[in-house]
A protein has these predicted regions:
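ABC transporter nucleotide-binding domain
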Residues: 176-265, 292, 509-522, 527-598
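Conserved protein kinase catalytic domain
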Residues: 76, 120, 222, 241, ...
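ABC-family P-loop ATPase nucleotide-binding domain
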Residues: 1-11, 272, 276, 280-281, ...
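Conserved short beta-strand edge segments in small beta-sheet-based binding/regulatory domains
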Residues: 282-292, 616-625
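ABC transporter nucleotide-binding domains
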Residues: 3-5, 12-208, 214, 336-540, ...
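Non-catalytic alpha-helical coupling and interface elements of nucleotide-dependent molecular machines
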Residues: 103-106, 226, 249, 279, ...
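Short amphipathic alpha-helices in soluble, non-transmembrane regions
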Residues: 243-245, 273-279, 576-578, 606-611
């Protein structure tokens, strides 16, 4: 079978910068190829060259047998390209948007209606065909854009980080659609910042500084991992990570949610030493065991070994500075943030409904919820930007309705879309925010020096902000938001679209801030990041449906058990397993499946029998502690069932 996508030694230069350096890859029909790499690695540039939007400096590429440079018209007839920015018309309905794209692609009138209806059914969007696109959630917009891209029946689908900023429920739906496309022999090339998504691809390429460092199946990529991984599960994973790093006994230490991975050449000795260290410090842990490497383990390790880990770690000097700046900023025993029955309506629509919670000083409080659940609305009210319709709230003792200007003086705020000025240099952005916060003279110079040290951008002080990668912009935006040393900081999806290395280092800083007494209020769609919070609240349709520590939510919320299932092609068996008695739901999870079941022993037996009937080898199946993603999805679905009157029966 001929490749549907074929690239040979693709190079793209912008002046003296080589953005893509000799990339060669191929993707066959009915195959998903995942392109992963740090910010600025060249993923988007590669996709743009393959879609004939951008001309390569040298090298060749073909789409469905057509040359991307000399036959761009035929290339565009055979591809669907979905960029990171929505290409939707928000004042048009779902149906009108799809019909408009059908016009653009020249889809014949005969059979068009049936084609659109098929795609709407295919994507579960038919119930919303009359809804205005601007009124859709982020996840539904992603699905609509995909439907628009598929209306002309392309042979190749190019997706540039399609699930960035999308909640886990919507991500699961999106990937179900992608797997259905494989049955139609579509070749899919997807760039992603989610390494668990890359686990689901047939093949993966690791791109860094424009070059492919490795490519192959996920299993082949994992074999690049040198050394064994010892896994420690703990409710205080961040403290465990710090302890293990300070011991200097391990080649690498990384945290994944509530689990710490130690890279070592001597598995037995490493596990025993870790146990001694944990017991000597009195840190809780559930288990210490050998762990098969994940793609994220390999991703981080390969980048470090090749010296291409991108943004360097926060320096100890910049992190320790928080111990001075946060001291004594919140009254002892008083919550830093407190709200009671907080409500916000927009006309007849209630965006936030009688929300109540309090956040002690120095705590990391995570706010989770699907797109459009009300997270950003709550943050805007707490920041004094939006007045509540009802209820009360205080930040540092200041009333959010009566003293919004006082609140703004004492908080830091970092939005989803980094509030930076692209036409200013790095240092000019810092100076601009220093002026907003009334910093001047020696104090401004001290804070500028601190910000440059903290971000690691000293060598890029005069660079235009627009040329920075997302990881660098993230650091600069954070530095600007805390330049005035606020005791409370609000972070609204601060790591959306940022690569795993940058995300991990960003959370190092958040932890250091909290240890210094800074209160951090953060929203996120990365369920792994939710594990790093001291407490969590899940908001859905404007209501808080659960609140507690990550451990409490994982052990007390779910009434059913989780079976972790691994086989060669999980997407081919998931629908069959989902129809078995006693199985409520089956979803893709990393490289395998998670099945939600009432009786794990009985359901497990039926699942084994189903694998035998399908003649598919079952690699392994075991009951596991629910992940935060499992809990998140279960709470959303339970709320939906309750509100639809189906209950639990």
């Amino acid at each position: 079978m001929q490749p549907a996508i074929l690239a040979r030694n693709l190079i793209k230069q912008f002046g003296g910068l080589t953005a893509v350096d000799g990339v060669s890859l191929e993707v066959r029909p009915a195959e998903i190829y995942g392109l992963v790499g740090p910010d600025g690695a060249g993923k988007t540039t590669t996709l743009r060259m393959l879609s004939s939007i951008m001309t390569p400096t040298s090298g060749t590429a073909e789409i469905a047998g057509y040359d991307v440079q000399t036959q761009s018209g035929q290339v565009k007839d055979n591809i669907a390209y979905m960029s990171q920015r929505f290409g939707l018309y928000e004042d048009l309905s779902v149906w009108e948007n799809v019909n408009f794209y059908a016009d653009l692609y020249g889809v014949p009138a005969r059979g068009r209606k049936e084609r659109i209806e098929d795609l709407l059914d295919f994507s579960s969007m038919r119930p919303f065909k009359g809804r205005r696109a601007g009124a859709l959630s982020g996840g539904m917009k992603q699905k609509l854009q995909l439907v628009c891209a598929l209306v002309h029946t392309p042979k190749v689908l190019l997706l540039d980080e399609p699930t960035n900023g999308v909640d886990p429920v919507s991500r699961r739906d999106f990937w179900r659609i992608l797997y259905r496309l494989l049955a139609r022999d579509v070749a899919i090339l997807v760039s992603t910042a989610y390494l668990d998504e890359a686990e689901r691809c047939n093949r993966v390429g690791l791109l860094s500084n424009g070059s492919l460092l490795a490519q192959g199946s996920p299993a082949e990529i994992k074999r690049l991992m040198k050394g064994a991984i010892v896994s420690i599960r703990s409710s205080q994973a961040r403290r465990v990570q710090t302890l293990m790093e300070e011991s200097g006994s391990y080649e690498d230490v990384n945290t994944f949610g509530d689990t710490v991975h130690l890279v070592t050449q001597d598995e037995a000795a490493a596990g025993q030493q870790a146990k001694v260290l944990l017991e000597s410090e009195g840190l809780p842990f559930d288990e210490i065991s050998r762990q098969e490497p994940s793609l994220e383990d390999v991703f981080v390790r390969v980048l470090k070994e090749t010296g291409e880990a991108g943004v360097r770690p926060w320096s100890s000097e910049s992190r320790s500075g928080f111990h001075d700046q946060a001291a004594g900023l919140t009254a002892p025993g008083r919550p830093a943030v407190e709200v009671e029955d907080l409500t916000r309506r927009f006309g007849s629509f209630t965006a936030v409904n009688r929300v109540s919670f309090s956040v002690p000083a120095g705590q990391i409080f995570g706010f989770l919820g699907p797109n459009g659940a009300g997270k950003s609305t709550v943050i805007r009210m707490l920041c004094g930007v939006l007045e509540p319709s009802e209820g009360r709230g205080e930040v540092l003792g200041f009333d959010i309705a009566r003293q919004p200007e006082k609140i703004k003086e004492h908080i830091g705020y970092m939005s989803q879309r980094f509030s930076l000025y692209d036409d200013l240099t790095v240092v000019e952005n810092i100076e601009f925010y220093g002026g907003i916060y009334s910093l001047a003279g020696k104090r401004l110079e001290e804070r500028k020096a601190w910000a440059m040290e903290m971000t690691g951008l000293a060598d890029h002080a005069r660079s235009m902000t627009r040329v920075l990668s997302s990881g660098w912009k993230q650091r600069l935006a954070m530095a600007c938001s805390i330049l005035h040393e606020p005791p409370v900081i609000f972070l609204d999806e601060p790591t959306s679209g940022v690569d795993p290395v940058s995300r991990r280092r960003f959370w190092d800083l958040i932890s250091a801030m909290a240890e210094a007494g800074v209160t951090v209020f953060v929203t996120t769609h990365y369920m792994e990041e939710a594990e790093y919070c001291d407490r969590l609240a899940l908001i859905y349709r404007g209501n808080i449906v659960a609140m507690g520590t990550p451990t409490e939510l994982k052990t007390r919320v779910m009434r059913e058990a989780i079976l972790d299932i691994h086989c060669l092609r999980p997407f081919e068996v998931m629908d069959s397993i989902a129809e078995l008695p006693g199985v409520r739901e089956v979803a893709l999870f990393g490289s395998g499946l998670h099945a939600v079941v009432r009786d794990p022993e009985e359901a497990g037996q039926r699942i084994r029998q189903e694998f035998e009937r399908l003649d598919v080898p079952l690699e392994r199946m075991e009951q596991v502690v629910p992940s935060m993603e499992d809990v998140f999805v279960a709470l959303i679905e339970e709320t939906d069932r309750r509100e639809s009157g189906q209950g639990e029966g």
